[in-house]
Amino acid sequence: MLVVLSPAKTLDVETPAPVTAFSQADLLDDSQLLINRCNQLSMQDIASLMKVSDKIAGLNVARFSQWHRPFVLNNAKQALFAFQGDVYTGLQAESLSLEAINYAQMHLRILSGLYGLLRPLDLMQAYRLEMGTKLENVRGANLYQFWGSLITQRLNKALAAQGDNLLINLASNEYFKAVKIKELNGLIITPVFKDQKNGQYKVISFYAKKARGLMTRYIIEQQVTALDKLKEFDSAGYYFVESASSATELVFYRDEM
């Protein structure tokens, strides 16, 4: 079972990670091409391209210009501990056991606009470059064209290494679009989390993101390998609903408090 997550815009690259073990991302040469392209952009270009304030654009101009290899522990941080958004609030990586972290290194991948695909212990430097950004580059008009089949090839390699063909898609649509489904040697299972509001069950973004993190933690702590075990997920009051699910979409409800 291989889990795929989105990254987060919120980062903490200052606080030391709870482990010193690290790995290097597979696609850093490709990342360097994107950094070279981003370093050609002005603050105004970035503000317009990313639809952000001048302050955030300025921060990212600085990040792009300061990005440099080699990555070591005093200039970079392991991806699992660097990302801090809603998904990662649910995951709470800092409190994972060493056994769970080692399991995650084999069974978890994080999609990234800049890095393509990250393992949990891959070092990264701070950045903001969302997968949906329409950044013209040496390979096309956007990041989907830039990454092409590279991400899917790495996912196939990870699926082959970890022993079965189940890929659990806990990423957002924006990021999972970077995966070429027809080229993937796996069965994609997409969990969906719906909260009850005014008597109806629907996806509420903030809660759904946190639930993706909770499920990721459940998978790597319990070392889940079978779908039946995945259906037993019940963190934070969620429960599996067979009648709302399909062969490739597992739906979990949570009742209104």
From Swiss-Prot:
The record's Gene Ontology biological-process terms are: response to hydroperoxide
Q: Which GO terms describe its cellular component?
A: cytosol
Per the record, the domain of life is Bacteria
The record ties this protein, via Pfam families, to: H2O2_YaaD
Report the family membership. Belongs to the UPF0246 family.
Question: What name appears for this protein in its UniProt entry?
Answer: UPF0246 protein Ping_3037
Instruction: Please name the source species.
Output: Psychromonas ingrahamii (strain DSM 17664 / CCUG 51855 / 37)
Upper lineage is: Bacteria, Pseudomonadati, Pseudomonadota, Gammaproteobacteria, Alteromonadales
